[in-house]
Swiss-Prot record:
<dbReference type="GO" id="GO:0070043">
    <property type="term" value="F:rRNA (guanine-N7-)-methyltransferase activity"/>
</dbReference>
<feature type="region of interest" description="Methyltransferase G">
    <location>
        <begin position="1"/>
        <end position="230"/>
    </location>
</feature>
<keyword id="KW-0489">Methyltransferase</keyword>
<keyword id="KW-0698">rRNA processing</keyword>
<dbReference type="InterPro" id="IPR029028">
    <property type="entry name" value="Alpha/beta_knot_MTases"/>
</dbReference>
<keyword id="KW-0808">Transferase</keyword>
<keyword id="KW-0963">Cytoplasm</keyword>
<feature type="region of interest" description="Methyltransferase TrmH family">
    <location>
        <begin position="231"/>
        <end position="498"/>
    </location>
</feature>
<keyword id="KW-0949">S-adenosyl-L-methionine</keyword>
<comment type="similarity">
    <text>In the N-terminal section; belongs to the methyltransferase superfamily. RNA methyltransferase RsmG family.</text>
</comment>
<dbReference type="InterPro" id="IPR029063">
    <property type="entry name" value="SAM-dependent_MTases_sf"/>
</dbReference>
<feature type="binding site">
    <location>
        <position position="89"/>
    </location>
    <ligand>
        <name>S-adenosyl-L-methionine</name>
    </ligand>
</feature>
<dbReference type="Pfam" id="PF02527">
    <property type="entry name" value="GidB"/>
</dbReference>
<dbReference type="GO" id="GO:0005829">
    <property type="term" value="C:cytosol"/>
</dbReference>
<dbReference type="Pfam" id="PF00588">
    <property type="entry name" value="SpoU_methylase"/>
</dbReference>
<dbReference type="GO" id="GO:0003723">
    <property type="term" value="F:RNA binding"/>
</dbReference>
<feature type="binding site">
    <location>
        <position position="94"/>
    </location>
    <ligand>
        <name>S-adenosyl-L-methionine</name>
    </ligand>
</feature>
Amino acid sequence: MRNGTIRYPGSDAAPGPDEMSAILRRCGIRLAPARIGQLWTYHQLLREFNPELNLTRIHNFANMVLKLYVDSLLPMNLVELPSPLMDLGTGPGMPGIPIKIAMPELEIVLAESRQKRAAFLKMAVERLKLEKVEVVGKSVGSSFEVPVKGVITRAVESVGATLERIAGCLDRDGLAIFMKGPQCDAEIGEALKRFRGEYRLWRDIHYTIPHTRNERRLVVFQRLGPPTRIRKETAMKRHGFRKIESENNDLYRDIRKLLTSRGIRKQQRALVSGSKQVHETLRDFPDDCLAWIAPGQEMPPPEGAPGHMSWYQMAPALFETLDVFGTRTPLLLIKVGEIETWDPVEGFPAGCSVLVPFQDPENVGAVIRSAAAFGAVQVILLRESAHPFHPKALRASGGAVLRMKLRNGPPLENLPENLPILPLSAEGRDITRHVFPAAFGLLPGLEGPGLPDNWRRKSFAIPICKDVESLNAATAAAIALYAWSRSGSQTKHSPAPA
């Protein structure tokens, strides 16, 4: 090797199988002469069809051996490759064909959606006389259900996108093997967060292609749960399921009404959205879960979901209407119990009770989340308030709506002035200098108009820069709750995670 370039015997002449074998051996890869012959035939096919099909941009012989064949074969020295193994987005057949040549006992699935390349793969498999090789000439998505024990890919698609793509085919305990460059920490982190509980990071191996400066990283995820096809079969036996394909379906119409406070009040049901909140609700409140709502049948309920829960398989367009936040993940239909009424005559228990007049459901959810985070004893929803189980409120609360003690209160105008209530208004006194009572109500103002004059006169404020007129009402309430929680006068109440 000189100046990073491998020199092989007879390099002034046209290279042949012996020169290919020499480079492979120097990289720690030893193949029998018959295997070298197959790899040489494959190399010749690449060279022959490359002008027509643009199979590779690498043309120098030594670089082709190093960056294509050695790169394809090194993973078999780093991890035990499972069988059947699918090469996803294989292009001209890498790493799948070199791996198959080196490990003839392995069953290989070559997946390539581009038809001309798929045709090349079929021809190459025939010319090389490779057995137990299947060419899949279409795009692989979550509905692809041919079972495999492993998936390997050199494609540039993100780890998370690929894990979603192979949901239907990779078996439980199967390996998803990613041949990456060195800078892939962000996509690994995103995938671990997104697929928590479904996959674990099994191996993360940094290496370099021998005799080059090309850094590589073999990132291997192991599947913890069953593939979609098994989950579907199990879920269909465990859960009653209904297909809903028309917007005129009565059940769909009822569910669509849950996008409004009125519908929630009337039906005493609500929709939970977002993968994290949905799975936490399933885990913590299984008895309240009524139905799993998903687009079609490709996202079945998870293992361990309560058996009484139904599975509604929505037509994609109908699901999109319900998925108001565009999560593209299943929704959860839950029952909402009666919210107990608070009578001002009973006053406030020890600690802070948050009085909520907000008409914006996002503000309602945000203040409930803050109340839970800072240990408020209860949230009293005044008559003006939006419903706490409105989809926007549920989402903004981070699930705190399900955990916080909620009460229904009177209209703002009917609040007795003799109660120990701390109103919040921009013109009030500095609340950070106030000594909080042992039991009191915190009253932020309505969005826009704020508080009535009788409450403004005795109000407290969050000190802010003079250049800023005011804070968002839910933000002001959160800061006031923080000030109370740090004041030393807080009656300890178990706060929920923020």
